[in-house]
């Protein structure tokens, strides 16, 4: 796993990431530059170059690696916000850009606050997997092609709003799960129990056994509903369902090993929260 070479003072990564995320989001001021006489593309290129030069001047590795990622996500959020308020058929893609950047940035920020011992550059989840990258690129390609050839398909506002609500619900549920689990939450399934590892059954974990997966499940499908992507909408639903089916089974094998009868009792009374997924089968 990629990570920080030296451990900084507690909370410094969170503050650094927040400051540089906001710095990237300051691209929202770009319309002011265009009014001052700069052309849109020229202004954008100069802005990006200026941001990168500033980060190179202020930070050295490994802090630069944190800063450049957070700043990039802030930049995407700012561009998405500008696009959201534009009078174009791409406005809903702006919603998507904001949702995507906030998801990845908040994964890092919450981990930095909640469980700094497990924090690394991988906490941004930007390099989650090849499959994740291919899925994202496919959704962008589908939106672009359909927006060119069937633009009316991208103007179903009520459907995009439904997708946005799914995204907000999924994001809030996942972050609530991360905060509730505290130091017990980790982006990687653990095969060895740490001394501080406890079974969390309160809060959102009293509703679902895997609330962070439930949140991510509805968030990912919601992004495609928001984009009015019929092909990726169906393929995302099937793919993430299969992924979380396998993931919950893998995780529950470890949890049963860690907590034994305590987890089995919890498993009996609380559902996974994922449709048609019951978790690992246990022969008693």
Swiss-Prot record:
Residue intervals on the Cytoplasmic side: 1-16, 60-69, 113-131, 175-212, 245-284
Pfam family, one: ICMT
Lumenal side stretches: 34-41, 88-92, 150-154, 229
InterPro entries per the UniProt record, alphabetical: ICMT_MeTrfase (IPR007269), PPMT_MeTrfase (IPR025770)
Biological process terms in GO annotation: C-terminal protein methylation; protein modification process; protein targeting to membrane; S-adenosylhomocysteine metabolic process; S-adenosylmethioninamine metabolic process
EC category: transferase
Cross-referenced Gene3D superfamilies: 1.20.120.1630
Main location: endoplasmic reticulum
Catalytic activity as recorded in UniProt: [protein]-C-terminal S-[(2E,6E)-farnesyl]-L-cysteine + S-adenosyl-L-methionine = [protein]-C-terminal S-[(2E,6E)-farnesyl]-L-cysteine methyl ester + S-adenosyl-L-homocysteine
Record-listed E.C. numbers: 2.1.1.100
Known tissue expression: Ubiquitously expressed. Expressed at higher levels in the cerebellum and putamen than in other brain regions. Abundant expression seen in the Purkinje cells and pontine neurons.
Keywords: Endoplasmic reticulum, Membrane, Methyltransferase, S-adenosyl-L-methionine, Transferase, Transmembrane, Transmembrane helix
Entry keyword annotation includes Membrane: yes
One GO term describing the cellular component: endoplasmic reticulum membrane
GO MF annotation: an example: protein C-terminal carboxyl O-methyltransferase activity
Membrane protein topology class: Multi-pass membrane protein
Binding-site positions, S-adenosyl-L-methionine: 190, 197-200, 205, 210-213, 251
UniProt-annotated binding residues for substrate: 247
Role description: Catalyzes the post-translational methylation of isoprenylated C-terminal cysteine residues.
Family note: Belongs to the class VI-like SAM-binding methyltransferase superfamily. Isoprenylcysteine carboxyl methyltransferase family.
Name of this chain's protein: Protein-S-isoprenylcysteine O-methyltransferase
Lineage: Eukaryota, Metazoa, Chordata, Craniata, Vertebrata
């Amino acid at each position: 796993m990629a990570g920080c070479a030296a451990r900084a003072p507690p909370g410094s990564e969170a503050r650094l990431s927040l400051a540089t995320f906001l710095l990237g989001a300051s691209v929202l001021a770009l319309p002011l530059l265009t009014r001052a006489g700069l052309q849109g593309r020229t202004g954008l290129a100069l802005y990006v170059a200026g941001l990168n030069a500033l980060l190179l001047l202020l930070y050295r590795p490994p802090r630069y690696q944190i800063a450049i990622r957070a700043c990039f996500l802030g930049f995407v959020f700012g561009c998405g916000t500008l696009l959201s308020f534009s009078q174009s058929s791409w406005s809903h893609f702006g919603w998507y850009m904001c949702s995507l950047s906030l998801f990845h940035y908040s994964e890092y920020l919450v981990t930095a606050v909640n469980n700094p011992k497990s924090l690394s550059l991988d906490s941004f989840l930007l390099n989650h997997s090849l499959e994740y990258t291919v899925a994202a690129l496919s959704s962008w390609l589908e939106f672009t092609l359909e927006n060119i050839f069937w633009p009316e398909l991208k103007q179903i506002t009520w459907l995009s709003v439904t997708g946005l609500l799914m995204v907000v619900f999924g994001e809030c549920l996942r972050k609530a799960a991360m905060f509730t689990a505290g130091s017990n939450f980790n982006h990687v399934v653990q095969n060895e129990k740490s001394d501080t590892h406890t079974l969390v059954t309160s809060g959102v974990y009293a509703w679902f056994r895997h609330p962070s997966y439930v949140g991510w499940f509805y968030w990912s499908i919601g992004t495609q509903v928001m984009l009015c992507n019929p092909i990726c909408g169906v393929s995302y639903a099937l793919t993430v369902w299969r992924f979380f089916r396998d993931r919950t089974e893998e995780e529950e094998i470890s949890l049963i090993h860690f907590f034994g009868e305590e987890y089995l009792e919890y498993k009996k009374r609380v559902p996974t929260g994922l449709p048609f997924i019951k978790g690992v089968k246990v022969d008693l």
